[in-house]
Amino acid sequence: MSPQTETKASVGFQAGVKDYKLTYYTPEYETKDTDILAAFRVTPQPGVPPEEAGAAVAAESSTGTWTTVWTDGLTSLDRYKGRCYHIEPVAGEDNQWICYVAYPLDLFEEGSVTNMFTSIVGNVFGFKALRALRLEDLRIPPAYTKTFQGPPHGIQVERDKLNKYGRPLLGCTIKPKLGLSAKNYGRACYECLRGGLDFTKDDENVNSQPFMRWRDRFVFCAEAIYKAQAETGEIKGHYLNATAGTCEEMIKRAVFARELGVPIVMHDYITGGFTANTSLAHYCRDNGLLLHIHRAMHAVIDRQKNHGMHFRVLAKALRMSGGDHIHSGTVVGKLEGEREMTLGFVDLLRDDFIEKDRARGIFFTQDWVSMPGVIPVASGGIHVWHMPALTEIFGDDSVLQFGGGTLGHPWGNAPGAAANRVALEACVQARNEGRDLAREGNEIIREACKWSPELAAACEVWKAIKFEFEPVDTIDE
């Protein structure tokens, strides 16, 4: 060993392994306005103290690795490291803690959800010292928010484009989701739109399969839109799914949709990826297309309470990446979603400023600094009897989407659409008159049945349909 090497080793670098908490657990740290803050639900392995587990999360999701490295001396760890600054036990759990981590903003590329998630929810989730790890919430600082375009248009611009105000929008997913020819698919869209719906929708797994290639579907759906608009005098739309195997193909499909003059396209943002989604959102803003977002694959990530990532984080990420609608659960339908928790992330999608509210699962105050809002879409196992509850829970700035609840009507698609439209208009009118939708909902629907045979038939078919299962993911007591 040369004398120069000996001198450097003796003065600075000390090889070996040391506890993460010696560097990354800093309870005295005062968070900065520019920090990205994260709340992790941490379940350590037996024998691992929570301080070490929380520090390990901060280290492995920022600058740290399993051993000391000499290149630490070539940068400022104090400037760039993540810090576990607070730990609190989870009520009712013996071995779970909420660990709060602050990340300096310089760790992340501007305008890139992909880069943000690669660090914060990257390899650390496979760390052996942790039995389980879940990201519960993120605080995105205004300094980072302003590097994102966000939704292509937002709620108010969509209202203005559609010229529809004062009520939720109505949609329908075309069923069966796979197997129809393009012409029959377009016919189903036309019947639903003519019957009174605002939108019809491709299901998330409708891309370009042998039974129905994307270009044929786009053409027949555009024909359905224009025909229904001419007959009803209302602006109509169909969520044309542009999701594809490559970004180039996805943009090609969006370009064709724009050439057809339709108002909206669709993307599966988790399976498609955040880079693809952000690219499509930029194209949609530049070319006047609304963007509907489906969350296929979300439950793989967010359903288990002790591991993965809560949907409120995926919802925030979508607002940053870009989308005008996103599926959010229904509370009352067939899919997972507790009421207060769902309303918490619905507010995070729509509102400009959201206060911390642990009772609704919101760990941090979030200021979106005028980033456009996203319309939540309630979809999955809902029908006309749910209309009062959906109107009361989600309010006007929402899309209520009835697939089977439209196409399953005994008289056909158009009567199914009419039944939903009548039920919605009745609920909105009753609410505007001061009636209590939660208490009087069934009575309101029965009254409307007297002057709508389509609604009466729908009510008879689905009068006994319920999905009464306890949610897996609940708010901590």
Swiss-Prot record:
Enzyme Commission code: 4.1.1.39
Modified residues (N-acetylproline): P3
Active site feature: K175, H294
Keywords: Acetylation, Calvin cycle, Carbon dioxide fixation, Chloroplast, Disulfide bond, Lyase, Magnesium, Metal-binding, Monooxygenase, Oxidoreductase, Photorespiration, Photosynthesis, Plastid
Keyword Transmembrane helix: no
Keyword check for Nucleotidyltransferase: no
PTM info: The disulfide bond which can form in the large chain dimeric partners within the hexadecamer appears to be associated with oxidative stress and protein turnover.
Gene3D superfamilies per the UniProt record, alphabetical: Ribulose bisphosphate carboxylase, large subunit, C-terminal domain, RuBisCO large subunit, N-terminal domain
Main location: plastid
Residues bearing PTM N6-carboxylysine: K201
Coiled coil: none
Propeptide segments, given as residue ranges: 1-2
Matches recorded under CDD domains: RuBisCO_large_I
Positions contributing to Mg(2+) binding: K201, D203, E204
Reaction(s) catalysed by this chain's protein: 2 (2R)-3-phosphoglycerate + 2 H(+) = D-ribulose 1,5-bisphosphate + CO2 + H2O; D-ribulose 1,5-bisphosphate + O2 = 2-phosphoglycolate + (2R)-3-phosphoglycerate + 2 H(+)
Entry cofactors: Mg(2+)
Broad EC category: lyase
The organism's place on the tree of life at top rank: Eukaryota
Positions bearing the site annotation: Transition state stabilizer: K334
Subunit structure: Heterohexadecamer of 8 large chains and 8 small chains; disulfide-linked. The disulfide link is formed within the large subunit homodimers.
Family to which the UniProt record says this protein belongs: Belongs to the RuBisCO large chain family. Type I subfamily.
Alphabetized HAMAP family for the sequence: RuBisCO_L_type1
Other information: The basic functional RuBisCO is composed of a large chain homodimer in a 'head-to-tail' conformation. In form I RuBisCO this homodimer is arranged in a barrel-like tetramer with the small subunits forming a tetrameric 'cap' on each end of the 'barrel'.
Function recorded in the entry: RuBisCO catalyzes two reactions: the carboxylation of D-ribulose 1,5-bisphosphate, the primary event in carbon dioxide fixation, as well as the oxidative fragmentation of the pentose substrate in the photorespiration process. Both reactions occur simultaneously and in competition at the same active site.
Protein name, as recorded: Ribulose bisphosphate carboxylase large chain
Source organism: Avena sativa (Oat)
